Structures are given as C-alpha cells and as structure tokens.
Amino acid sequence: MTVLSQEQRATSLEAMTSQKFDVLVIGGGVTGAGIALDAAARGLNTAVVDAQDWAAGTSSRSSRLVHGGLRYLYNLDFKLVAEALRERSRLLTTIAPHLVEAQPFLWPLKTPVIERAYSAVGVGMYDALARIGSRGRKTVPIQRHLSKAGAMRRFPEIKRDALVGAIEFYDARVDDARLVITLIRTAVKYGAAAASRVKVTEILKDGRGRACGVKAVDLETGNELTIEADRIINATGVWTEQTQDLAGGTGGLKVLTSKGIHIVIPRERIKATTGLFLRTEKSVLFIIPWQHYWVIGTTDTAWHEQLEHPVPTSEDIDYVLDHANEVLDPPLTRDDIIGTYAGLRPLLQPKVLDESKSTKVSREHTVTEVIPGMVAIAGGKLTTYRVMAEDAVNFALGESLAKARPSVTAQLPLLGAEGFDAVENQAHRLGVKYGFDADRLQHLVRRYGSELPDLFATIDEDPSLGKPLEAAPQFLRAEVHRACAVEGALHLEDIFVARVRLNSEARDRGGAAIDEVAEIAAAVLGWDEARLEQEKSNYRKRIAAELAAEEQATDAAASAARVVAEDIVG
C-alpha cells in the first residue's frame, strides 16, 4: 500500500537532498499533484513540495464539481467546454470512478418558449460535446425537458412562480481535497518524492542563468535544504507571481485573484432529489447535494488580502442566501447554515487589470517560461487538471523529449480506482462482519474505492477503530487513523480541513470532536502530551478566528479577524 506518512515524508526529504531530479514541482494543489503524477508516470525522477498541507489552497475550497462549464458555452468557449467534458468522462470511467460521481441538476426556466429553446440548444450542445469527448460512450444521461409539475416533483421546495418548466442535465461531483491527496499518493506509487510543509525560499541558477534547483525550509523542523533539479515547474496557483519572483527574471504569468464562497446546509433542510443550476446577474449559482449536506455557491469578487486564508464575509453569505432564496420556498436563513468556506481562483490576468470584469477572464490555462529551466502554469480549473499537467510537463521537457516520453495519465487509474466496480459489488458482504449499514458502506466505498479492504484490515488490527466518532458519527475512528497513517495529515487541522471536512461541514467546525480525533492522531503521529494540547489549542484558535471573520462586513476586516490564528510552524 502506498502511503503518505511521517516515514514516507522523511524518506522523500532525504532523497530531495541527496539526488538530482528531472522535475521539481512547486505546489501541491490539484495542478501540482497532477503534474507530479504525469512526470513520475513518464519515468522521470520527480519531486513535489508545498508550503502548506496538500490541497490547502483553492483545491480544497471549490464547488466540488467535475463539469464542462455549461455557462462557458454562452461565452462561445467551445474548446474549453469540450476539453473539460472529455476529462469528466475519463474521471468518471477510468481515472477516479470511486471519487467522481454523476450528479443531476435542474435548470429552472422562467419563460415557456424562448428560454426553453435557448437553453435546450445550449444543453444539447453540452451533451453532444460530452458524447464526442467520450468517444460515443454514455457516461451520464442526456438532458430531459420537464414540465413545471415534473420539475417540482424532483425539487418540491422550489417556488411555484420561479419556473414554468425545467431542463434536467448531468454533471459530476468530487471531494476535491481527496482527489488531490490521491493524486499525490499515486505519484509516490510511481516513484515521486513528496513532502508537504516545505517552503521554497530561493530559485538557484547555474552560471548560465538557468534554474537548477531551489533552497527550501522544512517548516516542521526548521531545517534548510537544497533540492537540485533539471526543470522546475511553478504550479502554485494564486501564489504564482510570488514564486516566480524568487527566480528574479522578467518572464512569467500574472494572475487575478478572485474569491468564491460557499455555504453548507443540512441535507434535510431542502427536500429534493437533484441539484439546481441558477443563472445570476454576474455568474451562476449551484445548489449541490453533497453527502449529508447541500453546498451552495459561488461568488466572484476581487480579493486583495493575504492569500493563505480567504474567508467569507457577512455580505458574501447574504449574497448567496439572497440568490438561493429567489427560488427556494421556504427560504433559507442564517440559522440554517452549518458551515462556510472560501477559495481563491487563480485567473489569468489581462494586460490591464479590470476587476469589474473578473468573471469574464478565461479559465483556460497558460504555460510559459519564467527563466530557462523554470516554467509556470496558471488558469484552468479542477476538471482539466490532467490536461494542464500534461501540457506543463511537455513544455518543460521540450518537444523532442516530450515525444520520446509521452504522457500516460489519460488511461491511468488513481489509487482506489482499479477494481472499484468489483469492490463496490462486494461491499455489502465485506461490511457485514463489522455491522455497517448500507449508508455507511456507500460512504466508505466512495471514499476509498478498491482500497476499502485496507481500511477493514486496520479495523481488524484494532477493533476500536471500527466505531464511529462520538461527535461526528458519519466518520469512523479508522478514517482518522488513515488520515494520519496513509493520507499525509501532519496536524490536527489537516484532518478536519482536508480529510474528514468537518471544518466546513459541522456547525462547530468539528469542535466537539477535537479531543477524540486528537487522541487517535497522537497515537499515529507520536505526539507527547504537550504536543497534543498544542494541536488542540491551535485548532480551537482557528475555529474562533473563522467564526469571527464571518461576522465582518468587509474582506479587510474578515481577513484581520482570521489571521489572529497564526499558521502552524513545526
């Protein structure tokens, strides 16, 4: 079994200081993780580092959708939509069928003829592009036209005057952070050295001015290290400019930072069997069924504060509530919200920054040379991470070497994907031994895929891990154990934010589960009593800061409230 553990991290750090790599990737979001896998799977000696936890930035704060971007059709971005739909098909069928699941949406229509025809053409093109991208295979159902009554049967809590009918179409959903962690683990399987919380502080250059490595610091120990590499790929998202500035060149990319927020609502609060796709005056709003919850968003506003911890403001939350309530009956209130989160989009910046048009900036990605030996990639979206990764590695290698060592990731299953169908079929039989009901088994299958037997083996070794968390019974104690032993969590907040997601999916942000989760983590990570108490204190401070930030009206005030809880170092 391939693991991200303390031992694996130490081994990777030792390799980083003792050998020269073909490719060094800076950035452990979905783009950087995808690049690390693409390079390693080509047989290139690869290393990947991130200054924070894996998926700590944008890649754990998305709408959790794998989609073609239906709205981009109306901007005539046919190439982008076709590319995204092709990648959606690959994720659903080959790359990560355990993590990516088809999801129906209703598009409510307000005018009986013109809008239905207009929307039907758009969704019809969407379906056609999807069928072309999947080479004729039907990976999701095609659109259906619904009467008002038919739409309200699927979504009973929509206002009667909010529609005259609807179009039902399909996209897909994914646990974004889990996808990133699985990409990193799969890259390690194919030989990559990977270490989170390693901050690059300098780009090294040889006598010809070519990038040849980096200086970095291990934020867990304070140790400095030098990593040598023939090629460096900057995949740091909203930190693109700061990272390329370390090289001191004139090349590189400019990105526009845009904030998007989501609110999380209990599943029972909205009675429906499908999601909603709503067009707004600036963009779109999704109401997405997600496990025991609804995720509703997003917004699109310029962000000028610190990049590490974007937070929703009270105005952001009101915006989402107001737009959702234009169609929901009964309307949502602040009391219905159990969680919120905010992420930053790294959008390619036009020559002249015009913040009022941030929603018009293309999501298509660009790769460029920063200095010889170092390239940067930015733009794109989660769905097209694999294409971005392939393009970045091809660019870094150059045409001749890229042809000699082509990408293989289009048909490469991630860990947990191979044999997923068989394990899904056997899940009930496998779970009977532990007394797990159908909902629990579905949850486990969708998180671990064909690696589910490994989780069961952990429970066999320690039956107490087969019990649910007392304060968060949707998760087993074994899942917390696995987060530390297999999935790379180094701190308590890593577990709550990117592994069990209670930071955004519980009204107290997981506060009631802190003691139990910390106890399990301490046993795996070897914390003494002082470290255990420090970890709990750090996460409680983070909770308090995030809740305080939500009460602020402006980005500046919210950011100031959030940074009261300092980042973990060591």
Question: Which functions belong to the PLM regions below?
Answer:
Residues 64-154:
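Dinucleotide-binding Rossmann-like beta1-alpha1 core, especially the glycine-rich loop
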Residues 19-21, 221-231:
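Core beta-strand elements of the Rossmann-like FAD/NAD(P) dinucleotide-binding domain
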